[in-house]
């Protein structure tokens, strides 16, 4: 394997959330990550959960994440830290969330105060956790669920940001977030926000006649064209990010609702590769062909269907093989380590929330309440990495079940 694939196999999971919800210490789950043969891990590190305000850490959260990161270093697992929540200034309807006030670059505006708080928050975070090699400074900002107007979720949700408004705001946020990270830890690398699919209902602005996953390339073109326009903070993409991230999920090409795009998907083929190559073509067009790419989320949900579980294990191996032969890809983070049964109590993506049946069954292992038993995709990934670890045993030792 060539040098840029040394950290190719990755996996993501909000392990501190799992510790808080289910009592098993977060760092113990890293034995599952290592058992899979993965040496990269994407950690949910929300600014608003680790910090009380942009300069003050929550001591409990600081201790938890430090434990997790210390264990990752012991196991030689590289960590990408990701946050998709931030603080908002007094005068906004919300104190925090995925929201921003109306874009207003006037000094002292609520919008500028929010950007300044974002910069300071990232400075604090990067300084607190020098163990984190890469900071992914946003998540799916091309979608309404992850970037919307202040107070949106408490409204009838009929007036999201337009795609142009979202991309303008995303460029601003990346610039200020990157400044903060580099102030806090000049040695850390900054990954762009990670765009995902685009549909008319979910947001993103992709013309309706394209397959939804070309929303990634579309979003990147919108971002790059703004940076290079001379109308934003800098025309140098390095001032916004060092690496580029995106989410190349496999979706059905059938005409279905947004909620069902994950369901009963077809076998990934060269079209899946081209979704990714199209995004990279955008990078090259704007002079960024030398930057590495993190595929920070991709995976499959079988919704508890045994036939889908078996089929998707094969699909997972196929996309790993494709990605291994994409020279620009540094790491592929499989989503996600664990099933989460609690997702059944949450609303789904069509309500701009993350929950429902499809969100339960992305896991490589069962929910801890079911013993963290390896599922078919876990064995498929272990086969790809060459791991001979006893995944059943690791799960039993972890949960005592």
Segments predicted by a language model, with ranges:
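A structural motif corresponding to the C-terminal end of an alpha-helix
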Residues: 36, 68-78, 124-132, 173-188, ...
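Aromatic-rich peripheral "rim/lid" segments of glycoside hydrolase catalytic domains that contact
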Residues: 146, 152-161, 311, 326-401
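Hydrophobic faces of well-ordered beta-strands that scaffold small-molecule active sites
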Residues: 7-13, 41-43, 79-83, 133-137, ...
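Surface-exposed substrate-engagement region within the catalytic domains
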Residues: 118, 267-356
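Boundary/entry segment of secreted carbohydrate-active catalytic domains
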Residues: 1-44
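Substrate-binding cleft and catalytic face of glycoside hydrolase catalytic domains
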Residues: 33-204, 251
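Noncatalytic carbohydrate-binding groove/subsite architecture in carbohydrate-active enzymes
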Residues: 164-309
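Short, acidic/polar
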Residues: 18-33, 115-125, 212-233, 313-322
